[in-house]
């Protein structure tokens, strides 16, 4: 399949579209700024309360007449541009495919050679997030502002979290082979000028986010303007890039516990012990992009294995080459111990995105300029990106669309096929956006017999109003039909002579319903959950005890307790914190107007990550290895991102 790299089939239509949008944009921008000036966020309200001279109100009163005059002057040009823009949308393609062409063999092509479908299994990491990159006036309805700056910061945080150096912990003690849950922290020392991660001698040091330079020793802000300096994607999966931490049984005696003093008097939250402010996170320095000093390091980074006694005379862990195994090999070792023995996989609230993130699905990337900024930042890690997904005008749907679908997909692996469908059954405000589903087929490897190993991913955003359960169920029905059609239309295999082997089938996105509200019973019992497994769900209306909500209470986004990834992580690990800062379903029979009656559960989990256990290659199975609720985007969105790591094991792997 030929992927679309431009929104229009020829340069003439593209040029005409640029001219028409240039005529519309001044009016669009003025309307957005004018409306935004009358919708303050809680952060701005606090600033105004501390402003005795009321300078902000004075500026608003001064500039409002100017904006109105400019708006009236721009209306004729906007009308003329609209006359050209609207009919052009019938020729517009449903997405834009972006790939960094100068990758050569350093990017996705090299990843395809890592797994041949034999021997040890292969893990794949998926993440989904609603980032609320709406026009600024609309984002303020959700208590968010400064969409352009947030887009850049979101991209930097995701890139820095996914590109973290891989950390492997080995225990020299023959008796103590476990690490306490409190010691799951970022156990890396600052990298040297050559970008090589240094082993930590003696004691273990927590590293704050400002000390981490994720892109080969460069500061994340150094390439904010023009994207990555070298143009190469970050590859954190090679053993040479691993940061080795050895805990000696003779010297250390035991692993560090949560209450152990930290060298230098550094605060336990990894923030250097400084005072916490209420400044929004997207106004911080580029280096403050998600704490690496969190006690919630991903298990992909913190691989636990037992080291032998044959340490080299130099005492350097890097000298023992036998320790540099691939993560998938070490994680399947019999000596591996889970943090949650009562669960088939690990789960956590993490302060940053998982290391070695392979696939990213985002929702509500509506603003075009914000989408471009976000894409440029994500290209520092992901080689393949689909953005500006959706339709405009009256194309594809019965009602006029002012916004696209808001979906964005990023991948480290090559994309083979793409399909997009717009939901026709929408109403109210959702009818103005072309919300739908994006279906992708990616290649993740090849067998020695030249059979392609592929995976299927679907990203969607369902109808938002909570009372419209019937509309969401209809969209879930369409989603299932489109999933089956996409698998059928893109499959080139036959049962007798398969050309492709399916490794995984994942569905994710913002479903806008939860599994604990009595008002969402219709969606909770949908047949989609019989074909795809939800790792957080026990059954309709019944969540696993560790699952938490992914929708934040927008009134508390800028509170000191949750304004940083570390702080939000600590809050969400306690039941009281979840009750205060997560959104909970409200009962229709609430006795007092405006009062929330908190129901069972740990908040509204409306962001889902599902995977199929059937329809894969025979003798292969995909099992959840870890599941994470991520706080790295605190202050930048009103949703918690979620991530899932799947281990795809072949029949040749030992049980």
Swiss-Prot record:
The UniProt record lists the keyword Phosphoprotein? yes
Q: Where are stretches of biased composition, namely Basic and acidic residues?
A: 212-222, 248-257
Q: Where does Mg(2+) bind?
A: 364
* One GO molecular-function entry: neutral sphingomyelin phosphodiesterase activity
Spans of biased composition, class Polar residues?
279-299
Active-site positions on this chain: 639
- Influence of pH: Optimum pH is 7.5.
Where is it predominantly found?
Golgi
Keyword annotations from UniProtKB, A to Z? Cell cycle, Cell membrane, Developmental protein, Golgi apparatus, Hydrolase, Lipid metabolism, Lipoprotein, Magnesium, Membrane, Metal-binding, Palmitate, Phosphoprotein, Sphingolipid metabolism
Q: Which GO terms describe its cellular component?
A: cytoplasm; extracellular region; Golgi cis cisterna; Golgi membrane; plasma membrane
Keyword check for Cytoplasm: no
Give the intramembrane regions. Answer: 11-31, 65-85
Family stated for the protein in its record: Belongs to the neutral sphingomyelinase family.
PANTHER family xref list: SPHINGOMYELIN PHOSPHODIESTERASE 3, SPHINGOMYELINASE FAMILY MEMBER
Q: What is this protein called?
A: Sphingomyelin phosphodiesterase 3
Query: What's the source species for this entry?
Result: Homo sapiens (Human)
């Amino acid at each position: 399949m030929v992927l679309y790299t431009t929104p229009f089939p020829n340069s003439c239509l593209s040029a005409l579209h640029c001219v028409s949008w240039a005529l519309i944009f001044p009016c669009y921008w003025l309307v957005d700024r004018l409306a935004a000036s009358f919708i303050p966020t809680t952060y701005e309200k606090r600033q105004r309360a501390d402003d005795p001279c009321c300078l902000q109100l004075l500026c608003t009163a001064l500039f409002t007449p100017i904006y109105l005059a400019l708006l009236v002057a721009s209306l004729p040009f906007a009308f003329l541009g609209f006359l050209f823009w609207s009919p052009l949308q019938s020729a517009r393609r449903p997405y834009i495919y972006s790939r960094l062409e100068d990758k050569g063999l350093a990017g996705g092509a090299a990843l395809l050679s890592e797994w041949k479908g034999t021997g040890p299994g292969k893990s794949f990491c998926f993440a989904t997030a609603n980032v609320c990159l709406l026009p600024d006036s609309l984002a303020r309805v959700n208590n968010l502002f400064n969409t352009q700056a947030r887009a850049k910061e979101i991209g930097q945080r995701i890139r820095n979290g996914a590109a973290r150096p891989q950390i492997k912990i080995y225990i020299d003690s023959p008796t103590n082979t476990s690490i306490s849950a409190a010691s799951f922290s970022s156990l890396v020392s600052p990298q040297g000028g050559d970008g090589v991660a240094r082993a930590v001698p003696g004691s273990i040091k927590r590293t704050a986010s400002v000390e981490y330079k994720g892109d080969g020793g460069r500061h994340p802000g150094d390439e904010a303007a023009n994207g990555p300096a070298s143009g190469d994607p970050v590859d954190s999966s090679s053993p040479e890039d691993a940061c080795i931490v050895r805990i000696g049984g003779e010297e250390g005696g035991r692993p560090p516990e949560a209450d152990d003093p930290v060298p230098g008097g550094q605060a336990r939250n990894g923030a250097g012990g400084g005072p916490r402010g209420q400044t929004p996170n997207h106004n911080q320095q580029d280096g403050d992009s998600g704490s690496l000093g969190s006690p919630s390091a991903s298990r992909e980074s913190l691989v636990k294995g037992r080291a032998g006694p044959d340490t080299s005379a130099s005492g350097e862990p890097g000298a023992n080459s036998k320790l540099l195994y691939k993560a998938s090999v070490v994680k399947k070792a019999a000596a591996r111990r889970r943090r949650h023995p009562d669960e088939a996989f690990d789960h956590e609230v993490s302060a940053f995105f998982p290391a070695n993130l392979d696939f990213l699905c985002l929702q509500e990337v509506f603003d075009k300029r914000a989408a471009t900024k976000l894409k440029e930042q994500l290209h520092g890690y992901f080689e393949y990106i689909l953005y500006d997904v959706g339709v405009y005008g009256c194309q594809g749907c019965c009602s006029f669309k002012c916004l696209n679908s808001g979906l964005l997909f990023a991948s480290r692996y090559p994309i083979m096929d793409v399909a997009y469908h717009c939901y026709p059954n929408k109403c109210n405000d959702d009818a103005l956006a072309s919300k739908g589903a994006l279906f992708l087929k990616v290649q993740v490897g090849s067998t020695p017999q030249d059979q392609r190993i592929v995976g299927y991913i679907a990203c969607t955003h369902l109808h938002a109003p909570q009372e419209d359960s019937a509309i969401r169920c209809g969209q879930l029905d369409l989603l299932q039909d489109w999933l089956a059609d996409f698998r059928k239309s893109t499959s080139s295999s036959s049962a007798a002579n398969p050309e492709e082997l399916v490794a995984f089938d994942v569905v994710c996105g913002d479903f806008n319903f939860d599994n604990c509200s009595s008002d969402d019973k219709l969606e909770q019992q949908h047949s989609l959950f019989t074909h795809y497994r939800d790792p957080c769900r026990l059954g309709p209306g019944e969540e696993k005890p560790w699952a938490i909500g992914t929708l934040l209470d927008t009134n508390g986004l800028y509170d000191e307790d949750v304004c940083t990834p570390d702080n939000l992580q600590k809050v969400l690990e306690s039941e009281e914190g979840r009750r205060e800062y997560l959104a909970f379903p409200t009962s229709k029979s609430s006795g007092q107007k405006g009062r929330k009656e908190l129901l069972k559960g740990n908040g509204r989990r409306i962001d889902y990550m599902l995977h199929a256990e059937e329809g894969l290659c025979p003798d292969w199975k995909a099992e959840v290895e870890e599941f994470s609720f991520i706080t790295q985007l605190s202050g930048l969105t009103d949703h918690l991102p979620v991530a899932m790591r799947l281990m795809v094991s072949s029949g040749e792997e030992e049980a």
